[in-house]
Amino acid sequence: MSMTDPIADMLTRIRNASMAKLQKVDIPSSNLKVSLANVLKAEGFIKNFKVIADNKQGVLRVYLRFIDEKEPVIREIKRVSKPGSRVYVGSDEIPSVKSGMGVAILSTSKGILTDKVAREAGVGGEVICTVW
């Protein structure tokens, strides 16, 4: 079975695992998913991640972060740009998530960036997801 939106699958696995209070979740790996996990780690939404090699595409293991071991740090993680409805923004149109409390993650010409970094760099791109 082919997957039409692997990024949405990754975000859904992270959302479900955090709601179920799991410490880690395994996701089929790709370069884009590793870049996305890198941004989530830098912003403090996940503890860590590692890529485990197998004979296929590899597995991305994401270690989730919780507040007092009970409440997940990720309250909401939502896909914005979808395969059937892409959302592109210019550097002056980058959305603010929850009045700056959350993060929008963009795919730009300079790589996967947060909304703040993209504004500072003056680049726009495709809005992958929002996290808060």
UniProtKB/Swiss-Prot annotation:
Q: What SUPFAM superfamilies does the annotation carry? A: Ribosomal protein S8
At the top level of its lineage, which domain of life is listed?
Bacteria
Task: Point out the gene that encodes the protein.
Answer: rpsH
Protein's name in the database: Small ribosomal subunit protein uS8
- A GO cellular-component term linked to this record: ribonucleoprotein complex
- What keywords are annotated for this sequence in UniProt? Ribonucleoprotein, Ribosomal protein, RNA-binding, rRNA-binding
The entry sums up its family as follows: Belongs to the universal ribosomal protein uS8 family.
Its job: One of the primary rRNA binding proteins, it binds directly to 16S rRNA central domain where it helps coordinate assembly of the platform of the 30S subunit.
Q: Which organism is it from?
A: Geobacter metallireducens (strain ATCC 53774 / DSM 7210 / GS-15)
Give the quaternary structure.
Part of the 30S ribosomal subunit. Contacts proteins S5 and S12.
Q: Name one GO biological process term.
A: translation
Q: Where does the secretion signal sit in this chain?
A: none
GO MF terms held by the record: rRNA binding; structural constituent of ribosome
One Pfam family it belongs to: Ribosomal_S8
